[in-house]
């Protein structure tokens, strides 16, 4: 991104590497998506479409942009893997750390609360490429989930925070039979509620490490 000297804005802009600006960019995007989330909730409560329209304008831009993203690469393995879709390490789909992939949390909530309006008002680009909002949203949400399931930490704080990122997009998916790969909300929720994986403990194993004293 281009950085501006606040003390002297007339100075030429300076290109700032993502590794030095990433959290700031993500923070700005979280702030914007939170506005969409809040507006969608107000629409759900009141039925006033002006709030749904506001949320949809934000969500649709995020959705289309994210649809064309690939997971970040880390050829030097500073995060524990080469990135992309390779299991292991801590990289998220969007952020350097999976536990900071919180854009999807706010996007999923906006999607859920303004769902009916979003479906009726797809982004123009989706119509141009012959896709609908529901299909693209599911694909994008599942990317965040699938990356989260093979990244982060198996136990402790990392594990719980990783599930926190993944839970909301899981809940807005349809049932298993809606998807060609058979992976809908039931499939993913089973991994949280019942079945631990090599990368994340499920709730029964989380409780085994819970210290009732401290």
Model region roles, listed by residue range:
Residues 25-214:
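Aromatic-lined, polymer-binding surfaces characteristic
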Residues 1-17:
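Low-complexity, Ser/Thr/Pro/Gly-enriched N-terminal "stalk/linker" regions
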Residues 19-21:
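Acidic/polar surface patches and capping/hinge elements
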